[in-house]
């Protein structure tokens, strides 16, 4: 049986005086966390799946650290297209790996979380797994003793929404093939 995990994405935290589309991101995120704690106290883990910050500023990540102090769940942070790796690492220095990816075995399921941030793309919003990350994923899937669930900020299959599909994972066909060939996803 798969144990409960929580997935949240696109927090877009900003400095306290800045709204996005008429909403206060920090207030909305805190309300979401309160709801999760009230209605899902049995959740084993919380994955924050990228776009943690709106501008990728250190201040925005510092706001996130303050919020995370009150979260009752073990939490994994992932990066999205609005995040900036150097500023993230300045605030979260205990994340020593080059990419913010890894896996957790939760029950008899391996949850693999990918770092799809592509900081060198001409379209800064699209995602990519460079060859190093593709190799890591292939190896991680091969070594898994359990079925695998894969999490990523950028989607790998066309959604039918043109605006979103323009910023999907650029090498999605390669990644989808690796996932299918593994027989574990």
Regions of interest found by a model, annotated:
Residues 50-55, 83-84, 156, 166:
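Short histidine/acidic/glycine/proline-rich micro-motifs that form metal-
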Residues 1-3, 51, 94, 119, ...:
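Homeobox/homeodomain signature
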Residues 14-19, 86-88, 120-124, 158-162:
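A short acidic, helix-capping loop that chelates divalent metal ions and anchors anionic groups
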């Amino acid at each position: 049986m798969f144990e409960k995990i929580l997935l949240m994405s696109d927090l877009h935290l900003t400095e306290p005086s800045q709204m996005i589309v008429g909403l206060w991101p920090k207030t909305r995120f805190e309300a979401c966390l309160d709801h999760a704690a009230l209605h899902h106290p049995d959740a084993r883990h919380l994955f924050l799946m990228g776009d943690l910050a709106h501008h990728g500023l250190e201040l925005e990540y510092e706001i996130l650290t303050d919020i995370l102090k009150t979260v009752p769940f073990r939490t994994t942070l992932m990066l999205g297209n609005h995040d900036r790796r150097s500023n993230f690492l300045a605030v979260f220095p205990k994340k020593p790996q080059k990419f913010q990816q890894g896996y957790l075995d939760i029950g008899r399921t391996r949850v693999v979380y990918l770092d799809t941030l592509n900081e060198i793309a001409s379209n800064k919003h699209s995602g990519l797994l460079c060859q190093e990350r593709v190799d890591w994923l292939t190896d991680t899937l091969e070594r898994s003793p359990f079925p695998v669930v894969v999490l990523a900020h950028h989607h790998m299959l066309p959604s039918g929404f043109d605006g979103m599909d323009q910023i999907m994972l650029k090498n999605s066909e390669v990644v989808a093939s690796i996932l299918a060939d593994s027989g574990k996803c």
